[in-house]
Amino acid sequence: MNILKLILRLFLKLFFKTKLTYHQQILLNEPSIIIPNHTSFLDAVFVFAYLPNDVCFVINTRIAKKLELPLKLINYVTIDPLSPYSLKKLINLVKSGQSVVIFPEGRISRTGMLMKVYNGIGLIALKTNATLVPIIFTGLKYSKLSRVTDKFKAHFFPQVSMYIGDSFKLDP
């Protein structure tokens, strides 16, 4: 584990009182698609801090332009969600053995609840036979960096739970 992840984990544990729950260790010894819910701008920070180094974050090209500096610290690939070639790019990436993190909702929730899940992840999983690893965050919707601050009282450091679900594969 690199020093940045260690410092980040300590910070998240101390200030957000992070509780990590999982039924099985994420080994990522085969291509996997990690699919967290997206309730805050902090979701990716938590995923980066608690997952192994060899994951690649999938980021919208438009958003990546705004995050140039922090993106230098992680492994990522940009996609244009309106281009059908983006799916082909991701299929080839996963087929090459790379595990990826994709937020299946495509955007941060405005309600704090799960929003529409796009079917591109299912197509990638079927074409690559990749393992799907769900991650559920609770508590981040109460952070100042969520988009639902008008519905809940926002806090700088809400208590956060990160639940890593059992991995599974889709049947063709």
Question: What positions do the PLM features span?
Answer:
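Helix-to-loop junction immediately C-terminal to a conserved catalytic motif
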Residues: 5-38, 95
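Catalytic core of membrane glycerolipid acyltransferases/transacylases, capturing the structured
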Residues: 28-83
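Short, basic, glycine/proline-bearing loop/turn elements
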Residues: 7-8, 72-78, 104-107
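Residue-level preference for the first positions of well-ordered beta-strands
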Residues: 31-33, 99-103, 133
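Short gly/ser/thr-rich secondary-structure transition/capping motifs
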Residues: 13-21, 81-82, 144-147
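Hydrophobic/aromatic ligand-binding patch that stacks against planar heteroaromatic rings
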Residues: 46-47, 70, 92, 123-127
